Amino acid sequence: MKLYLTAILALMISLQTSAKEPESKPKAPPAQNEPLRQELLAMFKLDQKVRIEALQALHKQGVAVGQTTSLGDPKVLLVVFKQTFSMTVIDDAHRRRLDAIIDEHGWPGKTLVGADGANAAWLIAQHADIDRAFQKKCLDKIEAMPRGEVEPQHIAYLTDRILVGQHKPQRFGTQMDGQFKPQPIEDEANVDKRRAEMGLEPLAVYQKKAKDAYEQLARGDKPAK
């Protein structure tokens, strides 16, 4: 059986290069809950570490980004099993912790945990594929936050993740297949308009950045900014 193996692993990484960044930002005030911010940042670091290790492990087996190969190769199969298991264990632990944080504090927005802490919280929800109901709970919480407390692109990414998980067309084209082609998109002719409204770059630009970044990560390079 042939599969795009990197779709199993690489697409679990959520790129930080997809949003339009303003040329300059005012200095953000300190987080109200610095210990919680640091906890979320540590979770973010571990989330990305295990995924980058998975990409690099496949790269060492000669599996390139977007390449189709056979699961009959025992070495590749072992890498897929080990890395997917590691990610699942970490993602579930992070999901349970984020759920407890939400119950205690509500959604951790920028005021509570800073912009980077809020980004980390979103990423944990984005990767909680084992529990779609939890992802929907997170999306509802994020959408209910006051303006400026969350990034609009986080809503776009999580909306698409949930829709694709339900085998429905996505709205913003954030979720790719193993060859970095978007999963089916609702009203695809207007996708760039919807992306712009959420602070996302055009789909074609995102596709190229995604593929380039994953290839660099697989080689052990740092993605270009």
Where do the PLM segments sit?
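Positively charged n-region of N-terminal signal peptides that target proteins for export
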Residues: 1-4
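Bacterial N-terminal signal peptides
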Residues: 6-14
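Short, charged low-complexity intrinsically disordered segments located at boundaries
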Residues: 127-134, 170-175, 223-225
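N-terminal helix-rich structural modules
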Residues: 22-166
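A cross-kingdom marker for long, charged
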Residues: 190-225
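An amphipathic alpha-helical core segment
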Residues: 139-201
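Boundary at the C-terminal end of the N-terminal hydrophobic targeting segment
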Residues: 17-19
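A periodicity- and composition-biased signal for non-globular, repetitive helical segments
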Residues: 8, 57, 200-201
